[in-house]
């Protein structure tokens, strides 16, 4: 008898702790929404640079799989238009697919 009361009481405590009220969730979401900021990283513009040219944004590079990537030359960071991601043909194909997806979400005109 005492064991069944302990089991029921424990179950009720777990249920109360595990399922917070809807009101507290709404308050937490409201606070989160107040702190959120929208950051626009890409600006819509037509492409003007070919593979190998220096760039600042993906939209500047012409080509469906061409992105503005970072390479290091003599210890300095250089951004340039590129589409090759690897010397391995399989990895390069996957990289071009990722570049295509990245360009799709860049919203370039």
UniProtKB/Swiss-Prot annotation:
<keyword id="KW-0960">Knottin</keyword>
<feature type="disulfide bond">
    <location>
        <begin position="59"/>
        <end position="108"/>
    </location>
</feature>
<feature type="disulfide bond">
    <location>
        <begin position="47"/>
        <end position="62"/>
    </location>
</feature>
<protein>
    <recommendedName>
        <fullName>Hainantoxin-XVIII-5</fullName>
    </recommendedName>
</protein>
<dbReference type="GO" id="GO:0090729">
    <property type="term" value="F:toxin activity"/>
</dbReference>
<feature type="propeptide">
    <location>
        <begin position="19"/>
        <end position="46"/>
    </location>
</feature>
<comment type="function">
    <text>Putative ion channel inhibitor.</text>
</comment>
<feature type="disulfide bond">
    <location>
        <begin position="55"/>
        <end position="68"/>
    </location>
</feature>
<keyword id="KW-0964">Secreted</keyword>
<keyword id="KW-0872">Ion channel impairing toxin</keyword>
<keyword id="KW-1015">Disulfide bond</keyword>
<comment type="similarity">
    <text>Belongs to the neurotoxin 25 family. F7 subfamily.</text>
</comment>
<keyword id="KW-0732">Signal</keyword>
<feature type="signal peptide">
    <location>
        <begin position="1"/>
        <end position="18"/>
    </location>
</feature>
<dbReference type="GO" id="GO:0005576">
    <property type="term" value="C:extracellular region"/>
</dbReference>
<keyword id="KW-0800">Toxin</keyword>
<feature type="disulfide bond">
    <location>
        <begin position="61"/>
        <end position="81"/>
    </location>
</feature>
<dbReference type="GO" id="GO:0099106">
    <property type="term" value="F:ion channel regulator activity"/>
</dbReference>
């Amino acid at each position: 008898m005492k064991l069944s009361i302990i089991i029921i009481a424990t179950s009720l405590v777990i249920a109360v702790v595990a399922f917070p009220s809807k009101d507290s969730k709404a308050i937490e979401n409201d606070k989160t929404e107040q702190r959120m900021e929208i950051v626009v990283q890409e600006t819509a513009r037509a492409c003007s640079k070919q593979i190998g040219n220096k760039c600042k944004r993906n939209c500047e590079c012409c080509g469906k799989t061409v992105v503005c990537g970072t390479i290091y030359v003599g210890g300095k960071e250089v951004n340039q238009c590129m589409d090759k991601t690897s010397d391995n043909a399989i990895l390069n194909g996957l990289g071009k697919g990722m570049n295509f997806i990245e360009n799709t979400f860049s919203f370039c005109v």
